[in-house]
């Protein structure tokens, strides 16, 4: 079982302040001050208010919602004058409601852009975040900025918090963990990618992306091991 990130409560209280004291999201050599990075969870009073903010800015959802409201009002008007709820009215309401639900579902789907996913993997490889590490806040900020600047999201608030970004990363590398093979003589493991795994998994993925997947998965495996070692130091979990 993978541990969850601990919530960071040291973010700045002023959402209008500059989110960074120094550094640039596009320059990994100039580190960001994670304590001063402002994420949506620091700006919004609740997740519900954040979600409402995002949905309102999705024009296609709002257009369909307004059309649905107009349909409801028109149907109620027809019922008021005719006193009859006809099958056509029911179908009209169901179609309008289905369109709204479909648009909200598409809004909540994970972004599948390969460049975005590769950048996230490279951010993890660059920052080598630990479990519950402050590096995840920096990574989340960088990814939010990238999605906004690349036009893949309408606001710079795609990930509500670092926990959400971390969960997305875990889903991305799920099934991509390198096999850990144990040297029984030295009780030390070493990580390798079996030939059959490399041949069968992600055969349609570019070699660079494939390397990023396995490298990021290796870093995650190390982070998980270090986390549990810190929680149970007397168990003697072997180093990877």
From Swiss-Prot:
**Changing residue 18 to I: what effect?**
In strain: CLIB 219, CLIB 410 and CLIB 413
Observed effect of gene inactivation: Cells lacking all 10 proteins of the DUP240 multigene family show no obvious alterations in mating, sporulation and cell growth.
- Effect seen on changing residue 67 to F: In strain: CLIB 382, CLIB 556 and CLIB 630
Q: Where are the transmembrane segments?
A: 61-81, 84-104
* One GO term describing the cellular component: membrane
Any keyword Transmembrane? yes
Source taxon at top rank: Eukaryota
* Database matches in InterPro entries: DUP/COS
Localization per Swiss-Prot or TrEMBL: Membrane
Keyword entries, A-Z: Membrane, Transmembrane, Transmembrane helix
Q: What is the effect of changing residue 70 to L?
A: In strain: CLIB 382, CLIB 556 and CLIB 630
Q: How does it sit in the membrane?
A: Multi-pass membrane protein
Q: Where is this region: Disordered?
A: 1-29
Q: Which family does it belong to?
A: Belongs to the DUP/COS family.
Miscellaneous remark of the record: Has been shown to be a pseudogene in S288c, CLIB 95, CLIB 388, R12, YIIc12 and YIIc17, due to a naturally occurring frameshift at position 8 in these strains. The sequence shown is from strain Sigma 1278B, the closest phylogenetic relative of S288c.
Protein name as it appears in the record: DUP240 protein DFP1
| Native species | Saccharomyces cerevisiae
Q: Which gene encodes it?
A: DFP1
């Amino acid at each position: 079982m993978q541990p969850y990130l601990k919530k960071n409560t040291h973010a700045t209280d002023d959402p209008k302040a500059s989110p960074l004291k120094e550094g640039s999201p596009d320059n990994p050599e100039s580190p960001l001050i994670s304590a001063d990075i402002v994420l949506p969870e620091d700006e919004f009073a609740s997740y519900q208010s954040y979600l409402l903010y995002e949905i309102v800015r999705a024009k296609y959802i709002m257009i369909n919602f307004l059309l649905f409201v107009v349909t409801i009002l028109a149907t109620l008007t027809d019922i008021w004058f005719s006193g009859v709820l006809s099958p056509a009215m029911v179908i009209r309401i169901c179609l309008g409601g289905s369109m709204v639900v479909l648009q909200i579902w598409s809004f909540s789907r994970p972004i599948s852009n390969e460049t975005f996913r590769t950048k996230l993997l490279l951010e993890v490889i660059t920052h080598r975040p630990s479990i519950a590490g402050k590096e995840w806040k920096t990574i989340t900020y960088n990814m939010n900025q990238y999605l906004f600047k690349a036009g893949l999201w309408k606001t710079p608030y795609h990930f509500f918090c670092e926990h959400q970004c971390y969960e997305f990363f875990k889903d991305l590398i799920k099934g991509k963990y390198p096999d850990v093979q144990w040297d029984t003589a030295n009780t030390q493991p070493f990580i390798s990618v079996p030939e059959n795994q490399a041949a069968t998994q992600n055969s349609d993925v570019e070699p660079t992306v494939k390397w990023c997947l396995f490298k990021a998965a290796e870093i995650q495996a190390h982070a998980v091991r270090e986390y549990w070692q810190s929680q149970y130091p007397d168990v003697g979990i072997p180093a990877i």
